[in-house]
Amino acid sequence: MLAAVAFKTSGLVVLIATTLVLVTLVSVNSDLTGTLGAIAGTWFAVHLVPLTIGGTSLGVAPLLPILIIGWSVARTVHRAVDPDTDRRMVRWVFAASLAGPLAVTAIALAVAGDASTVIGLSSPNALAAFSWVAGVHAAASGTGLILARWDSLVLRRGVPEWVRALVAPFVRALSILVAGGAAVVLLALLASWETAGALVESGRDVVGMLGLTALSVLYLPNVLIGALAVATGSTAGFGDASVSLFATTGGPLPPLPILAVLPEGPAQTIWVVMLAVPIGAGLLLGRDCAIRSADIQVAASSVWVVAAAAGVLAALFGYAAGGSLGTFGTVEVTVWSFGLLTFAWLAVAGTISAAIVVWRRAEPEPEHDEPASTVVPAAEVAIEAAPAAEPKDGPDVEDVVEAEVVDELPAEPAQEPVAEPAVDADTDEPLDAEIVAPPGDTDGPAR
C-alpha cells in the first residue's frame, strides 16, 4: 500500500510525459536523442519548477497539470487511510506520499544534468526543485488525510465548533469566485472569438493547431486567476501589456489562442460590472455565516476569518500562476493587491449581508389584535365546568361496559305484605258477593 501511495501518481506523470514527448518528437520528424532530458524537463514543468531552455528562462508553468496531480495524490492518500487508522500508520502514509516524488525529482535532476550537453535544457536549482515538489505533494497529501480522518479529528481531537462551522461557507465562497472568474473568461473569449480562431490557424497544420489548443487548455487556470484578479480590482500583467478595471496597456504577446481574452482597446466603463463577482461572493458568505449564528459579532467574526483565508489562498495562487516568459517579460498578477482586495470585498460585503440577515431574524413579529374577552356569568361557568350527569336506567346509554357474562339465576319471590283488598270502583272485573238482608228486615224484601 505504501508503495502505491509513493509511486502511483508519480509513475503516471512520468508515463504521460514520456508519451507526450515521444509523440511530439515523432510528429516533427526529430531524432530521439534528447528524450530523457525532455521527460525530466516535463516533470519539472508540471511541478512549477522554473526552467532555463537555451538561455531563456521559463517560469510560467500551466496550473492545470498541477491541479490534476494534487487531486490524484489526495485521492490516493484518502483511500489509504480511514478514520480508524492509527497515527503511526498515518505518518507512514504521509511520508510515503513525499518520498516517491522526491526520489523521482532526484533522478530527474541527474538526467537533466546529463542532457544539458545534448539539448539546451539547463538543470534547475536543486533547492527550488525539491521545495516545489515537496510543497505540492505535501499540500495534496495533507488535504487527503484531513478529508479521510475528518470525523476522527472532530470527535477525538476536539476541532472547535467554529472551525467546523466555517468549512462550508469557505468552500462556497471559493466556488463562487472561481465560477465568476470562469464566466468572465468565457464572455471575453466569446467577444474575441475571431481573434482566437486566427491564433489557432497560425499553427498552419493540424499538429500545430492541436498543440496550440492543448496549450490553451493547460494554461486556462492561469488565465482564470488573472481574470479574477482584474475582477477584484487588481492588475494582471503580461510583459509590457497589463489589464485592470480602469486602464489597459498594450504589448507583444505570444500566439496563444487563450490570450485572445485580453482586450485590444482601452478600458470600458462596463467592466465595473465584474465587481459583482467578489461582492456577490461576499454577500452569500455573510448570509451563510449569519444563518449559523444569531449573534452579529460572531457572524461578522466568521466572515472576516473566511475572508482572510480566501485572501491568503488568492495570493498563493496568484504567485503560482505567474513567472518569467523569456523575451516576453514577466507574467504576473499584483499578488499583494489581489490577496488584499479579495479579503476586503469578502469582508465588507459579507459583514453587511450578515448584519442584514441577523437584523431581519431579530425583528419582532407584528402583533395581531386579540378579540375582546366575553364576560360569562358565574352560573354558566359552573354549569359548563360541571360534568354532565349520565342517566342510570336510560335506554339510550352509549357507554360500553365490559362485564363477564354469567348464568342467570332465578329470582327469589318477593314477600309482599298482606293487605286487605281494596275495591276499586272503576275496576272492570266482576266481584263475587252475597246479598244479605239488612238487620231487622228478615221477613220480606226491603222496601
Task: Show the residue positions of the predicted features.
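Alpha-helical transmembrane segments of multi-pass integral membrane proteins
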Residues: 96-155, 190, 194-196, 283-368, ...
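Long, glycine/tryptophan/cysteine-rich extracytoplasmic
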Residues: 1-71, 111-116, 205-274, 320-344, ...
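N-terminal hydrophobic or amphipathic segments with adjacent small-residue motifs
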Residues: 94, 220, 227, 301-304
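Hydrophobic alpha-helical transmembrane segments of integral membrane proteins
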Residues: 2, 6, 166, 271, ...
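N-terminal membrane-targeting/anchoring modules of bacterial envelope and secretion proteins
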Residues: 1-210, 356, 360-364
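Extracytoplasmic/cell-surface-exposed regions of Actinobacterial cell-envelope-associated
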Residues: 127, 167, 171-184, 199, ...
